[in-house]
Curated annotation (Swiss-Prot):
PANTHER family: 39S RIBOSOMAL PROTEIN L10, MITOCHONDRIAL
Role: Forms part of the ribosomal stalk, playing a central role in the interaction of the ribosome with GTP-bound translation factors.
Quaternary context: Part of the ribosomal stalk of the 50S ribosomal subunit. The N-terminus interacts with L11 and the large rRNA to form the base of the stalk. The C-terminus forms an elongated spine to which L12 dimers bind in a sequential fashion forming a multimeric L10(L12)X complex.
Organism annotation: Natranaerobius thermophilus (strain ATCC BAA-1301 / DSM 18059 / JW/NM-WN-LF)
Name the UniProt record assigns to this protein: Large ribosomal subunit protein uL10
Alphabetical keyword list: Ribonucleoprotein, Ribosomal protein, RNA-binding, rRNA-binding
Amino acid sequence: MKKTRQEKERMVEELTEKLSQAESAVLVDYRGLDVAQMNELRRQLGDSNVDFKVVKNTLTSIAAENAGIDEINQYLEGPVGIAFGYDDPVVPAKILNDFSKENEELEFKAAILGESVVGEEKVKNLAKLPSREELLGKVAGTFQAPIAGFAGACQGIIRKFVYAVDAVRQEKEDAS
């Protein structure tokens, strides 16, 4: 069924908004994936707050121009799916990379990070980076280790002090 001009304009507006708000947008060629694989991909992305859209390339091109990301047009050939990540720029690339290991038909095309466009190789490198949560966990662990060590040392000192006071008390009781 053919879409009306109003529907297309609404889709362009929605896509422009997504491109503007997303931390990252990863473009993939999904040719060769069957319906079950596409549904599984959408489910995995959705579980991590990542939207996945398949929109006509001409509408995507117009939305990219509206969002000030004209460089993406060179990657809009063939069937293109776009994964929009809002919380962490690494998450869409990681999920798509993991999915492509099991489904070789899925191929990276490019990614939009902020207002810059990067090619396939940089997207694959992005997928290898730790996520924001992993980095925060490492930072917290780095801060926690010295604090835990300090707390352990303080407990040791207090324990020794208590033993010393108890020994003095014991001596006084024995002397009386």
